[in-house]
């Protein structure tokens, strides 16, 4: 069954949150697609993932890469699973994919300070529950650590 995790960003950027979540995914041996809603955003995330920290390397490519099937992380703007990912991150209000049931995990990261993003996340929550997916909601505590909320 597909597990859907909703990550509620407040007073933090996607750029600060995404790299550690991707690192944890790779540590677990998962392959990942990160879907945003524009080519410009995907390219900005691509540049950020190469430079976000001096002492790390996060192997990835965009959907345009000729060897996308060999990459552990693909940044995309459309549906599809070019690298046979187990996990799909949905950022910037990217919609649930038609093949959502084909992933072990979907991670919907949304900006809680953006009314449209909040409304879209609520709609996605309802949709995921209706599809029978296991859904969890995550928010940071006062120390900035992710905590599951019920």
Where are these regions (language model features)?
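Structural motif
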Residues: 9-10, 33-39, 74-76, 89-94, 107, 111-112
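Helix-adjacent hinge/juxtasegments
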Residues: 47-88
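Glycine-rich, aromatic-bearing surface loops/beta-hairpins
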Residues: 105-150
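Short, solvent-exposed amphipathic alpha-helical segments in soluble enzyme
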Residues: 21-24, 48-52, 106, 123-127
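Long, hydrophobic N-terminal alpha-helical segment
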Residues: 1-47
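ASCE RecA-like P-loop NTPase motor cores
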Residues: 2-4, 25-31, 94-101, 123-131
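An N-terminal amphipathic alpha-helical segment
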Residues: 16, 83-98
């Amino acid at each position: 069954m597909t597990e859907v995790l909703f990550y509620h960003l407040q007073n933090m950027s996607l750029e600060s949150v995404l790299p550690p979540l991707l690192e944890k995914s790779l540590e677990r041996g998962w392959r990942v697609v990160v879907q945003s809603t524009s080519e410009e955003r995907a390219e900005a995330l691509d540049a950020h993932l190469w430079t976000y920290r001096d002492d790390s390397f996060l192997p990835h490519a965009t959907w345009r890469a000729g060897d996308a099937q060999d990459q552990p992380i693909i940044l995309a703007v459309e549906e599809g699973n070019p690298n046979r990912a187990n996990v799909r991150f949905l950022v910037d209000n990217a919609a649930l994919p038609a093949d959502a049931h084909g992933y072990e995990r979907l991670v919907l990261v949304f900006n809680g300070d953006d009314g449209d993003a909040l409304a879209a996340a609520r709609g996605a929550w309802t949709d995921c529950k209706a599809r029978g997916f296991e859904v969890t909601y995550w928010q940071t505590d006062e120390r900035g650590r992710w905590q599951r909320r019920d």
